Amino acid sequence: MWFDFLRRGKKEEKKKETRYILTIDGGGMRGIVPAYILKKINEELKERGLSRPLYSYFDLVAGTSTGTLIALGLTAPIDNLGLKKEEGDDWEVTEIVEKGRFRKTTEIVEKGKIERLGDPESLLGLYTENGKKIFIPDDSKGLWKIVGKMSKMLGDKYDTVPLEMFLDEVFGDTLLSEARVPTMAVSTNVSGCTSYIFRSWDSHGFLLREAARATSAAPTYFAPAVFIDRETDEKLTLIDGGMIANNPILAAYIEARKLYPDADEYKILSLSTASPPCILHPEEYVTNIEWLSHLTSAYSSANMNITLEGVESIKGVEVCRVWEPVLEKKIKLDDTSKEAIASLLEASQKIWDQDKERVYLFLDELTASPVGDRLKLKDESKTKESLPALEEPGRDGLYLPS
């Protein structure tokens, strides 16, 4: 008995703390690919009998450009969103609280509920049904078409009004701070060409649609987004986050280290937009103009590759990168044609078929993890019932109903 008392009193070893991150690349209409992958992941969770909302498994969700649209669609409250709400009841979360020094008992405390937000399976519709609302094709002909092309050479290719109307329709006036898990969007500040990160946990009063507008302001396609920071009164001129981090994985890791400094591991699910590998053929480029036409894509591809390699080399970081070179030709970020959409959907299925086993392994660990301590829950805490002492619940002591 005395030996058993000493054994019980021994300090328990600290359990390994693992944080899970979802990152989504930029790429305009190629956002069809990560939206499709998330749809398949959600279907897989249901096949496993898990109906907990997908977003609630992650400790941080990050996006660049079109990836931000998907990230916010996953994590923001549905009340004002132009997205289909996921069906099903909210999920109750309880905490096991131990009481008593010698005769231990436990109480089950209702911590709140995990809300149903945007249905991951409806994210595809943002592109397949709304692409032409944002990238309005030029239907003019003859001389007027030539005049239109010449005018666009001197300015941005698209008017920002349709984009802003679409974002207002989807997000309304919902605040970025209302995201239910930490969510971030990468944009580029033209002052110094530095990154500007929109953070739900330090939102400076920004709206969801403002973050989405800034991070998707692709140069030559849309005019920069100009905002006044509501906390500092600083004037910000922001452009597409893809200029500095089309794959937001490094920015997400940096922010995760700040949010969760005591974590032992960071496991990242990184979703691509299926941009094809960049292959240069210098022997074919005779003039500087020919070189220049390939340099932008070469720089972007090289930047993404070295960023991914750098994060993968960090101790304590594991990356599940969902990308395969399946697109037969490059699809422009504003290509809303039926052929382009069909090609992207076909590529999405091929990528899923090739990478799903690795994703399943990631999901095995993800779904076994405890509820994150930064997940915002509905309703207030209250004691449900008292029970005999139980085993240590793990990080945060939070449980889902069986």
Tell what function each PLM region has:
Residues 2-402:
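Conserved catalytic cores and adjacent C-terminal regulatory segments
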